[in-house]
Structure formats: structure tokens, C-alpha cells
Swiss-Prot record:
Pfam families: Fe-S_biosyn. The keyword Hydrolase does not apply. InterPro entries: FeS_biogenesis, FeS_cluster_insertion, FeS_cluster_insertion_CS, FeS_cluster_insertion_RrpA, HesB-like_dom_sf. Belongs to the HesB/IscA family. It comes from Alcanivorax borkumensis (strain ATCC 700651 / DSM 11573 / NCIMB 13689 / SK2). Iron-sulfur cluster binds at C47, C111, C113. This is Iron-sulfur cluster insertion protein ErpA. Its cofactor is iron-sulfur cluster.
Length: 119
């Protein structure tokens, strides 16, 4: 990797862990579609005001922020990136099950389950 690509990755407004990238690869392989990308978005709702959402998408929209890691692409729309700036997407396995989670430095409060937040 060149120094230019490393600095682009370090300055990305959102990032994701190796565990998240590995899980996306696994799910993408299960679907048999190498064009699937993980889209992270924000919606109104949840017990704290905003909720995180995750879906697979084949389309990269013009205003999307796109980050690549280990051949996996993470997409965030223009509205959501303002709330997710500096966040890290991870994949966790625990007693409550397995799920993608967001560590968001912009969240003033989060709910107990971690799926909603307020700013």
C-alpha cells in the first residue's frame, strides 16, 4: 500500500474493523454476489432519537461516502455521514447475539442496546 493510500484511509470519515470486513465477506459469499457492499445509515427513531441501520447494496450513489478494506466496501449516504463522522463499524459476537455495531464519537447518549443514539 502506498503512503498516499494509507493517508486516505486514515483520513476517511468512517472506518470499519477487520471483524466487520470479514463478516461482510462471509455474508457476500453466502449470497454469491461479489458486488454487494455494506451500507450504514441513520434513521429517526429508537429510544434515543436516531437509529443505526445496515443493509446490503449493489449501487454506489453519487453522494455516497465509500471506504474500502480488504476488498469490502462500506457505503454511507450524505445525510448519515454527518452523524457518523469519526465512527468505527465493528462486528461483535456475544450473549445478546451477533451484530454490527457502531462506535460513534458524536453520540451524546446511547440506549442500553447500543442501536440508537442522540446528538
Amino acid at each position: 500500500m502506498s503512503a498516499d493510500s494509507e493517508s486516505m484511509i486514515e483520513s476517511a470519515p468512517i472506518s470499519f474493523t477487520d471483524a466487520a470486513a470479514a463478516k461482510v465477506k462471509e455474508l457476500r459469499d453466502d449470497e454469491g454476489n461479489p458486488n454487494l457492499k455494506l451500507r450504514v445509515y441513520i434513521t429517526g427513531g429508537g429510544c434515543a432519537g436516531f437509529s443505526y441501520g445496515f443493509t446490503f447494496d449493489e449501487t454506489v450513489n453519487e453522494d455516497d461516502t465509500s471506504v474500502e478494506k480488504e476488498g469490502v466496501i462500506l457505503l454511507v449516504d450524505a445525510m448519515s455521514i454527518q452523524y457518523l463522522d469519526g465512527s468505527v463499524v465493528d462486528y461483535e459476537k456475544g450473549l445478546m447475539g451477533s451484530r454490527f455495531v457502531v462506535s460513534n464519537p458524536n453520540a451524546a447518549t446511547t440506549c442500553g442496546c447500543g442501536s440508537s443514539f442522540s446528538v
